[in-house]
Amino acid sequence: MEGYILDWANLLLRWLHVIVAIAWIGSSFYFVWLDNSLTKPTAPDLKDKGVDGELWAVHGGGFYNPQKYLLAPKQLPDHLHWFYWESYSTWMSGFALLTVVYLFNANVYMIDRSVFDMTATTAVLLALGFLVVGWLVYDTICRVFGKNDRVVGILVAIYVVIAAFAACHLFSGRAAFLLIGAMIATIMSANVFFWIIPGQRKVVASLKAGEKPDPIHGKRGKQRSVHNTYFTLPVLFAMLSNHYSMTYAAKYNWAVLVLIMLAGVLIRQFFILKHKGVVNWGYPAAGVAVLLGVAVWLAPVSRPAAPVAEAPAATAPAAAAEGSASAPAAAGQATAAAAGGSDFAKVQAVVTARCYQCHSAHPTLMPSPAKGVLLDTPEELGKHAQLVYQQVVQQKLMPLGNVTQITDDERTIIAKWFEGGAKTN
């Protein structure tokens, strides 16, 4: 029942997170477009009111004329709409989802002992540290070098590269990618919470008090808002990357992450300039070139299957990480015993020894079968043959962190079975 409840929490939080993220990104992209599309007003009355830019647009059968004031209107309207709950709700739902999926299952999803051996508690603390330290470093860079946008951009980019390298050498690949995305998303939402909204509140307070607002608040808010728009596409990739293991499972996965994020920034730059009337196809061309280069770099190389050892070396799997049950002690004997049987019998022995801990009706490493995938019957194993082959043989992602210590010989057993037609009889 606990696993069932967590699955529903995962579903509902993920749904909520996507909905509010669409609202936040949509409003952010709209205002970046609006800011860069404004034209100087020609009507004297608009100039007298302090309007610095305006735009005429048509949408949904109606005409719109948004106007932006150089600093603020002389008199505030009775109702003033604020844009901040989109940001806050996106971060809160995202952190809740991170907690339910990753922090509650650190042994399974965050730790890869072939990368860095640590306890679940250490993994959780390090993950939280990435979020906090990421914001503190970024904010310090902006405070110290804020008057020079180029220097800020270079230093922030360098920090993201360092953070990506560190994360990929501490956590499992999928967790590392997600944490870098969460770190940048935390920076984005913290920009709204600590700088953009407080600055706007100070401007409003000054106007209500009959004082002239300090323009520095608008400048700081605009700078952080611009940073956020460049962060958006890299964060979206990091959040989607968990579905594409060829990226986070690569040998130099940190470089893959950095390069794809760079492609996102280049593509975003094209649209930002286009809003200003400047069309430079070099930016998207460079972004696409980077993506194609990464795709070619990561392309799998077809090799003939190696001959299967007559009696594969199979040792009893090590105990799973802290707080989880150990794999069956007789796993090695079961695998070796199947060495002389049919291809499918050998595969069943390997799956029983190495995969049942997460993919059976009664898993021992988690409350319910991971991703709802069961491998404890011939029918289920045959149905998921393609997935097993991809995850275990081609990408070597499973078992997660190789917690059950599957051997290369055992992976070859699965490869030979699948490439021979994945027969279950």
Tell where the protein language model's regions lie, with residue ranges.
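Cytosolic juxtamembrane amphipathic/interface segments immediately preceding
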Residues: 2-6, 65-83, 214-218
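Alpha-helical transmembrane segments
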Residues: 133-139, 195, 262-272, 294-299
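Aromatic- and Gly/Pro-enriched helix-to-coil junctions and flexible linker segments
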Residues: 61, 75, 95, 102, ...
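Long, contiguous internal "core" modules enriched in hydrophobic/ aromatic residues
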Residues: 103-217
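Membrane-interface amphipathic/juxtamembrane segments adjacent to transmembrane helices
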Residues: 28-72
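Membrane-interfacial entry segments at the cytosolic side of transmembrane helices
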Residues: 147-154, 249-253, 274-289
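Hydrophobic alpha-helical membrane-embedded segments
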Residues: 15-44, 183-199
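Alpha-helical transmembrane segments and their membrane-interface junctions
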Residues: 87-106, 165-178, 231-250
